[in-house]
Amino acid sequence: MRIGLYGGSFNPAHAGHLHVSRTALRRLRLDRVWWLVTPGNPLKDHGVLAPLDERVAQARALATDPRIAVTGFEGGIGSRYTADTLRWLVRRQPALHFVWIMGADSLGTFHRWRRFDEILSLMPVAVIDRPGYTLTAPSARAAQAFASARIPEADAPTLATRPTPAWAFLHGPRSALSSTALRTR
């Protein structure tokens, strides 16, 4: 089974998250996408973060597609960093083929994530285009560091079963929605 892992604060979850998930399901030929609602992002302001249980409930109410599952399990395993969460999942579910899903906006700061290189060694990564990042994301520090691991977009359906490191940048219709913009309204 091919599972896309889409981590984030989901503060709040919105139609843009659904767009990214459906794009990944279709373009990567995934069976499921799991939304990993984080208890707290070390790189973001926690002062504006709604409680985890509220964000999980709101995300579940939005994600009515049966192929999308919402979980807040990271809090239960005491994980603070994506690399730890992904290592935990890979060890417990060795038969599954995981792909980490991220928006192109996150690729610009990916090199600041703790052990970002380990994430790329644990599973392939799919970067979904976002407005304003089409041209800048591929020149991001992490993208340059792993330039040789980038696969052609036409090969994206094979990403889940490729040896790591491997990543793909997926162009296409983009959603301008963002949780930050929704919170400031």
UniProtKB/Swiss-Prot annotation:
Enzyme class: transferase
Gene3D superfamilies from the UniProt entry: HUPs (3.40.50.620)
Record carries keyword Transcription regulation: no
PANTHER family registered for this protein in UniProt: NICOTINATE-NUCLEOTIDE ADENYLYLTRANSFERASE-RELATED (PTHR39321), PHOSPHOPANTETHEINE ADENYLYLTRANSFERASE (PTHR39321:SF3)
InterPro entries: Cyt_trans-like, NadD/NMNAT, Rossmann-like_a/b/a_fold
Annotated catalysed reactions: nicotinate beta-D-ribonucleotide + ATP + H(+) = deamido-NAD(+) + diphosphate
UniProt-listed SUPFAM superfamilies: Nucleotidylyl transferase
Gene that specifies this protein: nadD
Listed CDD domains: NMNAT
Functional summary from the UniProt entry: Catalyzes the reversible adenylation of nicotinate mononucleotide (NaMN) to nicotinic acid adenine dinucleotide (NaAD).
Protein name per the record: Probable nicotinate-nucleotide adenylyltransferase
EC number: 2.7.7.18
Superkingdom classification of source: Bacteria
Pathway where it operates: Cofactor biosynthesis; NAD(+) biosynthesis; deamido-NAD(+) from nicotinate D-ribonucleotide: step 1/1
MF GO annotations: ATP binding; nicotinate-nucleotide adenylyltransferase activity
Keywords: ATP-binding, NAD, Nucleotide-binding, Nucleotidyltransferase, Pyridine nucleotide biosynthesis, Transferase
Gene Ontology terms describing biological process: NAD biosynthetic process
Family the UniProt entry places it in: Belongs to the NadD family.
Pfam families linked to this entry: CTP_transf_like
